[in-house]
Structure formats: C-alpha cells, structure tokens
C-alpha cells in the first residue's frame, strides 16, 4: 500500500471512519530517524501517515486540530509505539 503523507492532521478526513485513532511511533523500522503518526480504523491501518522530526511536533499538531485524548503504550505493544490518540 502506497502511503499518503500529510503535513498536518487537519488534512485527514475522518468522516468516513467509524472508530478512527492515531498511533504514534518513535523511530519505527520504516522511518528510523523520525516520528510517525499512522491513521487507523479500528485495528486496520489506513494509507495515511504524518512524519515529523520530533514527538513534540506530532503532539502539538494533534492537540491543535483534534479533540482526541492520548493513551500511552501498553507493555504488550511494539516498542516503537509511543501511544494512541483516540
């Protein structure tokens, strides 16, 4: 699946997603020097991602443009997962 990169979460159309969330990863395998926000529908990743240099950039953008709440990663989650915005 070809990723659709957005510069801001405000570019994402959540209207067609029943239970959307944003999973934030720190230095995942496919972007080892970046932070990545991946848009999900329930347990399925969509093709949309936001890539930034710092975690703070991602957090500020999501806080500014959504009403989502942050949930930190659990012990069973992949190590690169920072947490999920729902």
Task: Give the predicted meaning of each segment.
Residues 68-86:
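Short, mixed-charge low-complexity intrinsically disordered segments
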Residues 49-71:
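A short, charged, amphipathic alpha-helix used as a generic interaction element across diverse proteins
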Residues 4, 16, 44-53:
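Local beta-strand/beta-hairpin segments that build beta-sheet-rich folds
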Residues 2-34, 65, 71-73:
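Short N-terminal "domain-start" leader segments
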Residues 31-47:
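A short, structured beta-strand/loop element
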